[in-house]
């Protein structure tokens, strides 16, 4: 199943994250519709987190570093199903995921609900080179330091996701 393109149908949700209607992805901001996304942080066996640098051709956040995988949920899709789908589509990875929580944040004036998961994988591959400029494993300490010294190198969503994963893991981001 391909990643949701501009005309893919996604759920517009209310302020409690309950579905209201279905809208084309490309209209979510113009309609001021709340929506859902999923982010997965992938860790390797030594505890490094996989970062994805978005392609310079991307419409939103070109060249910025973000979560290992991220994307919109298809209409009717669960967060966990979207996490598995995006791992397969973007990294060629099939694995279990652990839920870290759901984050509510504002994106261009609308609310998005971000389902956050972690997993382990040592050898992901860039399965979408037009979408992803590069992948890089980085130590959690390095990421934490870069988020302080150069926050604009990262997407706003990743900054929040990483913080939530660290909180959920007792101040130490990890897959467990």
Language model features by range: what are they?
Residues 2-39, 45:
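Acidic, metal-coordinating catalytic segment for phosphate/diphosphate chemistry
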Residues 40, 69, 99, 115-117:
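A structural signal for short, well-ordered beta-strand segments
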Residues 37-69:
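A glycine-rich, hydrophobic loop/mini-helix early in the fold
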Residues 1-4, 174-176:
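Basic/polar N-terminal segments that are highly enriched at the extreme N-terminus
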Residues 50-51, 68-100:
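The catalytic Nudix box helix
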Residues 10, 48-49, 135-136:
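A residue-level structural signature of the nucleotidyltransferase/glycosyltransferase Rossmann-like core
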């Amino acid at each position: 199943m391909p990643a949701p393109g501009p005309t893919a149908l996604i759920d517009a949700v209310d302020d409690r994250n309950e579905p209201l209607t279905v809208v084309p992805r490309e209209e979510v901001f113009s309609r001021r519709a709340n929506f859902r996304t999923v982010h997965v942080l992938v860790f390797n066996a030594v505890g490094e987190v996989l970062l994805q640098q978005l392609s310079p051709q991307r419409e939103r956040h070109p060249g910025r570093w973000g979560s290992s995988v991220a994307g919109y949920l298809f209409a009717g899709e669960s967060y966990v199903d979207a996490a598995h789908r995006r791992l397969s589509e973007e990294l060629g990875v099939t694995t279990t995921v652990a839920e870290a929580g759901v984050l509510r944040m504002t994106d261009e004036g609308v609310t998005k609900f971000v389902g956050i998961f972690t997993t382990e994988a040592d050898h992901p591959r860039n399965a979408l080179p037009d979408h992803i400029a590069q992948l890089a494993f980085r130590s959690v300490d390095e990421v934490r330091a870069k988020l302080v010294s150069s926050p604009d190198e990262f997407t706003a969503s990743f900054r929040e996701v990483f913080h939530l994963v660290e909180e959920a893991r007792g101040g130490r981001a990890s897959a467990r």
